[in-house]
């Protein structure tokens, strides 16, 4: 960072979007002499607000690394012009026996255009099949409209949160901050009942103490959200799926077998009883498409 020090009036700025996770925080990129020198937050009320994570702010050096860029077009080991490359590609594609391998670090648009060139049946997305199934399931959830997808702002305003099988600090740090803020909302409501204004941080902190809102985390390994949670469950992927199935059954008014899982599910729902809104968080980390479907089902039932 010391070698990148530049006075702000010497920088050329442009709006951008962070590509390190799926949240897509809004950024302002500062450039000088053809190199990125500074990344700042760009306010967007519905996405990242006033904050970005350290990864988004400081992890930009790869952009300046010329060793990993394609500086010259090549055909084999021979440098070629753009026209020669296009002509060679045209000949390859005309034979109808060409496959294409996409990249999970390339843009959606680049992968789409590559797939259009070779056709759906000749395109490989460069992700494991289980992950592909999970992503396809998430797409179906979006398209169905049965469960409303919350913005970060809405997650921050939720009073109850359930994280199923996702280490949010690793996969989406800005979402993790929103969940931590959500965990304070229910205790904050208690402080407002005795007329402590929300802006009076010290008084609110003294009143709340270690009181935590109904944030529940179910994950095979410890996560950094555990310290803020009302209860953290150490469970395998199959056990988390069983917990989600039990929650769905209880929300549908069905009878469930007595036992530890039923008690945990009932405890979660009891804590959510007076919550104004609840957020369900799930992802592709465990590569369990059934868990994603159950998470969407829970969210849909809670909205009814």
Identify the role of each PLM range:
Residues 1-304:
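Catalytic alpha/large subunits of respiratory electron-transfer oxidoreductases
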